[in-house]
Amino acid sequence: MRIIMATYTTSDFKPGLKFMQDGEPCVIVENEFVKPGKGQAFTRTRIRKLISGKVLDVNFKSGTSVEAADVMDLNLNYSYKDEDFWYFMHPETFEQYSADSKAVGDAEKWLLDQAECIITLWNGSPISVTPPNFVELEVVDTDPGLKGDTAGTGGKPATLSTGAVVKVPLFIQIGEVIKVDTRSGEYVSRVK
């Protein structure tokens, strides 16, 4: 019996595509097709290794094939954290998955109880946790904004209920709830 592995060529490349590189699943962060005046066309990519988290710049000759990564993305709800692991539950089957600090990474500061996250599994184990694109968090510490103080940077640091620190407008006060984009870590709006 022959096992046929799925492959992608450089024409299939787009951000978010997962493939195998040096025996490790990777995801394309950025890609650009380059046709130089002389020589063969190539695709310039920035990839992130899903297990080690390393970000690399890799060039592929036009038409090169890569093996698809056998990874699975699941929408799971964040449940709780103990000393070593973060626990996520499938909303329909109630199956639990535990992710270590390497898999959670920077997502820790955006995890709220019951927030739906995307967990990437490889060989049945979580290797990556992606929080929701937007979260609503309470401001627990920030400098008071002085009325009329609009000179300068136009923002101030604020510590949120999860421990994350983001730059917010001067009018934001302690106790207010704000919406934050988890992909960039930037303030989006005040929640009414």
UniProtKB/Swiss-Prot annotation:
For this UniProt entry, the molecular function terms from Gene Ontology, in alphabetical order, are: translation elongation factor activity
Instruction: Kindly indicate whether the keyword Protein biosynthesis belongs to this entry.
Output: yes
Per the record, the major location class is cytoplasm
Pathway(s) this gene product operates in, as recorded in its UniProt entry: Protein biosynthesis; polypeptide chain elongation
Modifications made to the protein after synthesis = May be beta-lysylated on the epsilon-amino group of Lys-38 by the combined action of EpmA and EpmB, and then hydroxylated on the C5 position of the same residue by EpmC (if this protein is present). Lysylation is critical for the stimulatory effect of EF-P on peptide-bond formation. The lysylation moiety may extend toward the peptidyltransferase center and stabilize the terminal 3-CCA end of the tRNA. Hydroxylation of the C5 position on Lys-38 may allow additional potential stabilizing hydrogen-bond interactions with the P-tRNA.
The cellular component terms of Gene Ontology attached to this UniProt record, alphabetical and capped at eight, are: cytoplasm
| Keywords for this protein | Cytoplasm, Elongation factor, Hydroxylation, Protein biosynthesis
Q: List the disulfide bonds.
A: none
Gene Ontology biological process terms, A to Z: peptide biosynthetic process
**What InterPro entries does the entry give?**
Elong-fact-P_C, NA-bd_OB-fold, Rib_uL2_dom2, Transl_elong_fac_P/YeiP, Transl_elong_KOW-like, Transl_elong_P/YeiP_cen, Transl_elong_P/YeiP_CS, Transl_elongation_fac_P
Query: Does Electron transport count among this protein's keywords?
Result: no
| Pfam families hit by this protein | EFP, EFP_N, Elong-fact-P_C
Q: Where in the cell is it found?
A: Cytoplasm
- Which positions carry N6-(3,6-diaminohexanoyl)-5-hydroxylysine? K38
Task: Quote the function comment for this protein.
Answer: Involved in peptide bond synthesis. Alleviates ribosome stalling that occurs when 3 or more consecutive Pro residues or the sequence PPG is present in a protein, possibly by augmenting the peptidyl transferase activity of the ribosome. Modification of Lys-38 is required for alleviation.
Q: Which family does the UniProt entry place this protein in?
A: Belongs to the elongation factor P family.
This chain's protein is named: Elongation factor P
